[in-house]
UniProtKB/Swiss-Prot annotation:
Binding annotation for UMP: G51, D71, C132, G133, N134, P135, F136, F137, T138, T139
Pathway field: Pyrimidine metabolism; CTP biosynthesis via de novo pathway; UDP from UMP (UMPK route): step 1/1
Catalytic activity: UMP + ATP = UDP + ADP
Entry's Gene Ontology BP terms: 'de novo' CTP biosynthetic process; UDP biosynthetic process
Family classification: Belongs to the UMP kinase family.
Protein name: Uridylate kinase
GO molecular function: ATP binding; UMP kinase activity
Length: 237
């Protein structure tokens, strides 16, 4: 395997499937089975999951909610997703722990960096919920932060598109997909990959990002093996 320790970022929307809201159990199980295959080969894997399938803080703020309050509601939504993923992973035979940045010890461990790393070393998957515990930060930024903290080799952003484009491929059929590009290109071009804080964290800590289509069967395994799928972002192309 090309990567020994991976941070997988899943959007909340990815868990919806074809629904407009909520969680599709079939999608959760499909993701869990793909992860199980990777873990069985010895890769250490942690997951950060978003909450946009249940609540998105920015939308709440735009509707008049206090921004910090809306972000806290969004953080709680990510915990719901994290526990759901844990259930799916355990049914797929993968030992899993959920750690949350906001303590709720009846359902999850508090986030403790050294404990998270120890879980990974023991072959368990760790799902991080609750964002980074502070409002005004996205779950993409949380993914970059946790990747740096656990010394991950790479961040996988598994999404609904097959890579990074120079413009929206849904609106522009002639949009160009990048096979590889630099962090500086993403920041300078304001490309819609992750927010600038998330990109800067990976740039400063020299953690590459691979963006790929989550719904292409076997893509998580291909990405872990270092196959050329999606778009790779790093300090050098």
């Amino acid at each position: 395997m090309a990567y020994a320790r991976v941070l997988l970022k899943l959007s909340g929307e990815a868990l919806m499937g074809d629904q407009s809201y909520g969680i599709d159990p079939a999608i959760v199980q499909s993701i869990a089975e793909d992860v199980a295959k990777v873990v069985a080969k010895g890769t250490q894997l942690a997951i950060v999951v978003g909450g946009g399938n249940i609540f998105r803080g920015l939308k709440g703020s735009a509707a008049g909610m206090d921004r910090a309050t809306a972000d806290y509601v969004g953080m709680l939504a990510t915990v719901m997703n994290a526990i759901t993923l844990q259930d799916g992973l355990e049914r797929a035979g993968v030992a899993t722990r959920v750690q949350t940045a906001i303590e709720m010890q009846e359902v999850a461990e508090p986030y403790i960096r050294r404990r998270a790393i120890r879980h990974l070393e023991k072959g368990r998957v760790v799902v991080f919920g609750g964002g980074c515990g502070n409002p005004f930060f996205t779950t993409d930024t949380t993914a970059s932060l946790r990747a740096a903290e656990i010394n991950a080799d790479v961040v996988f952003k598994a999404t609904k598109v097959d890579g990074v484009y120079d413009r929206d491929p849904k609106r522009f059929p002639d949009a160009k997909r990048y096979d590889s590009l630099t962090f500086q290109q993403v920041l300078s071009g304001e490309l819609a990959v992750m927010d600038s804080t998330a990109i800067a964290l990976c740039k400063d800590n020299n953690i590459p990002i691979v963006v790929f289509d989550l719904f292409e069967p076997g893509n998580i395994g291909k990405a872990v093996a270092g196959e050329a799928i999606g778009s790779r972002i790093s300090n050098a192309t």
